[in-house]
Amino acid sequence: MLVLFVATWSDLGLCKKRPKPGGWNTGGSRYPGQSSPGGNRYPPQSGGWGQPHGGGWGQPHGGGWGQPHGGGWGQPHGGGWGQGGGTHNQWNKPSKPKTNMKHMAGAAAAGAVVGGLGGYMLGSAMSRPLIHFGNDYEDRYYRENMYRYPNQVYYRPVDQYSNQNNFVHDCVNITIKQHTVTTTTKGENFTETDVKIMERVVEQMCITQYEKESQAYYQRGSSMVLFSSPPVILLISFL
């Protein structure tokens, strides 16, 4: 009885120590150059090198390089680069263009930007200037027809011009052009006298607009310098 017990115990120990088939360096997947009943297993059957489940190189589940779940490069769940689920965290979106706050402030203080005129603004209504043209006929003509001439001018921000003359020249041209086109479409025409008088009137209004815009521009610049000085910044930080 004792001998039978010892023999049975020995058989159980040998069964536990016996290696399982299919492990490293077994007949199921040997290193290249080692013969095996299954033939050369390099690369292993049913997948490429390092393919546990039939995927490509380094593909645990059939995805691409470094793809745990079938997404693209660096895609944990099938989204784009840097996309956790393809719906957010898209850091590579182009950033929105920044708005020039200086020009916005200038436009708000001066007038509305006119659509379709390439950034020109329309100034506030003015009283038509009192002008003497050097002869009684033109003086009288102006007094009788001044309502036909513009009382607002078109202009660009003053910081886009190197001097007053350039500002005024551009202001006069665009204002007369727009006023002439608008008035002509209503069936009203201008004579040579009208054009001559209108040029003088609009020029004076553009000079007034330039002086107004220049003053506002330098005031805004002074305010920005004041608030950007270190003592003011320090004071604001304690408020």
Swiss-Prot record:
Disulfide bond entries: 171-206
Keyword entries, A-Z: Amyloid, Cell membrane, Copper, Disulfide bond, Glycoprotein, Golgi apparatus, GPI-anchor, Lipoprotein, Membrane, Metal-binding, Prion, Repeat, Signal, Zinc
Region Interaction with ADGRG6: start-end pairs: 16-31
Annotated positions binding Cu(2+) 1: 53-55
Residues holding Cu(2+) 3: 69-71
Disease linkage: PrP is found in high quantity in the brain of humans and animals infected with the degenerative neurological diseases kuru, Creutzfeldt-Jakob disease (CJD), Gerstmann-Straussler syndrome (GSS), scrapie, bovine spongiform encephalopathy (BSE), transmissible mink encephalopathy (TME), etc.
Name used for this protein in its record: Major prion protein
Upper taxonomic lineage: Eukaryota, Metazoa, Chordata, Craniata, Vertebrata
